[in-house]
Amino acid sequence: MRVPAVAAVVLASGGGARLASALASVAWAGERIVLDPAARLTREPLPRGVRLHAGAAEPLELTTAPWVLLLGDGEIASADVPAAIATAVAEPGARPAYRIPVAVQGFGATLRPPRAPIRLARRSEARLRIGPGLAVDLGPPAGHAGQLRSALIVRTTERLGEAVEHLDAQATTLAALLAERRRRPRLWHLVLGPLAAGGHTLVARPVRQRGSARWFLAVLAGYRAAVAYAKLWERRRAESAERW
């Protein structure tokens, strides 16, 4: 089915199969946009009709569609997401924004954080928010956010080297977003940021779990936050050196 009222914005960290899967999962959207804050994908081949925005921007600036759906490039929309969204946005009393669960799959486990992020919002509300642990969503909404049952899915590679490489790319994207917001890295960011990111994974509800997978996924989440702040720190140092 098609949902022309929705523009799907993919917050990209890298290209290749992960980005292609994210875009394919929202082929039903009226518009598909790749947001590339770190400007790394200027030569990435994209499907016909997909627009690329290199550099930081708010989703509301990228489209005239009434609604915006936000995905990461490692996420895919499950098969029942379009119907759930179509029903929600067509309601006369539609909320200004909706929370959508995110299920993390990897290393034999499937985890779902207890609080779903806001990933669907009216265009006027569609601003990126970077929360504790550097989780990115849309918000805060002007009113109470609704809740969809259908989920977005994150499929973590089972190969440690590939997982670390992808997390490093995500950290580069997050550092670009933080720099655009003039965030100044502090020592406590390097300490508390990874703890918050890992903590979100540790308290996630296990849909399916094997052995120590939860701890391993928590370590990876903490690693991403630590590297993002380290990259922001280095970026600030380079900017200061250029001024002198």
List each model region and its residues.
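A short acidic, amphipathic alpha-helical/loop segment
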Residues: S21-S25, E58, A84
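Cell-envelope/extracellular polymer assembly enzymes that use nucleotide-activated donors
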Residues: A5-A7, E31
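Catalytic metal- and UDP-sugar-binding loop of GT-A-like glycosyltransferases, i.e.
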Residues: L69-D73
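Active-site regions of enzymes building and remodeling cell-envelope glycoconjugates
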Residues: G30-R32, L46-A54, G143-L148
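Acidic ATP/Mg2+-coordinating residue in the GHKL
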Residues: D36-P37
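Active-site-proximal specificity loops/subdomain of glycosyltransferases
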Residues: R40-P66
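Short, well-formed alpha-helical segments that are part of the catalytic scaffolds
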Residues: V9-W28
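Catalytic-site signature of metal-activated, phosphate-bearing donor transferases
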Residues: L60, P66-V68, S78-E239
